[in-house]
Regions:
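Residues at the starts of beta-strands that form the adenosine-phosphate
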Residues: 85, 93-94
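A short helix->loop->beta-strand "cap" motif at the edges of active sites that frequently abuts
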Residues: 7-11, 93, 149-151
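Glycine-rich Rossmann-fold phosphate-binding loop(s) that bind the pyrophosphate
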Residues: 77-78
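An N-terminal-biased, well-structured beta-alpha scaffold segment characteristic
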Residues: 1-15, 120, 140
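Phosphate-binding beta-alpha-beta segment of Rossmann-like dinucleotide-binding domains, i.e.
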Residues: 16-71
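Short beta->alpha connector loops at strand-helix junctions that form conserved
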Residues: 9-21, 99, 157
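N-terminal Rossmann-fold NAD(P) dinucleotide-binding loop
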Residues: 81-82
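Rossmann-like adenosine-cofactor binding region
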Residues: 96, 100-172
Length: 172
């Protein structure tokens, strides 16, 4: 709370963009964990399930899938979102992006599109927007209904960008 800090003489600074690379890398860490099922395979091994099978190989469900060829939808092309888009190209992903405020000279390999188009085409949607009245609950029942049934959603923005009770119901 900035007002609280100011009343106590505590200086609060906004170091905009200082953590952009770290957040972009975390986004891909989360994507890799979800797609490659790293968390499930880790649990499987730690619980010694692999010792109970004829083969020491992980079961097929633990193999996950590749990022290559997937379509990534990036919502917000600021310092973080644009870095996420660049990293995605290194994984041979197709990149769709929505940001009504981004500069028009953004990378030619990024397909700028409408939010509705991005949501309906992306295999993975990542959120990189500030929390404003316009972005609060931008991922809601309507936007979730536009997404592919097996699409992944990674939010490294503020929590309230996603209507979490609606997301919880959609996941049921």
């Amino acid at each position: 709370n900035v007002d609280f800090a100011a009343r106590r003489g505590i200086l609060v600074c906004n170091c905009r963009g200082e953590n952009a690379q770290a957040v972009a890398e975390m986004t891909f860490g989360l994507l890799l964990c979800l797609l490659r099922k790293i968390h499930l395979a880790d649990r499987y091994i730690r619980e010694d399930h692999w010792k109970r099978t004829e083969s020491a190989a992980l079961p097929e469900w633990a193999m996950g899938s590749e990022l290559k060829g997937k379509t990534l939808g990036v919502i917000g092309l600021g310092q973080i979102g644009s870095r996420v888009a660049r990293i995605a190209r290194g994984f041979d992903m197709k990149v769709l992006a929505y940001d009504p405020f981004a500069q028009p000279q953004i990378d030619a390999l990024i397909d700028r599109t409408a939010l509705e188009d991005l949501l309906s085409r992306a295999d993975i949607v990542t959120l990189h927007v500030p929390l404003t009245p316009a972005t609060e609950k931008m991922i809601n029942a309507r936007s979730l209904a536009m997404m592919k049934p097996n699409a992944l959603l990674v939010n490294t923005s503020r929590g309230r960008v996603v209507d979490e009770p609606i997301l919880f119901e959609a996941l049921r």
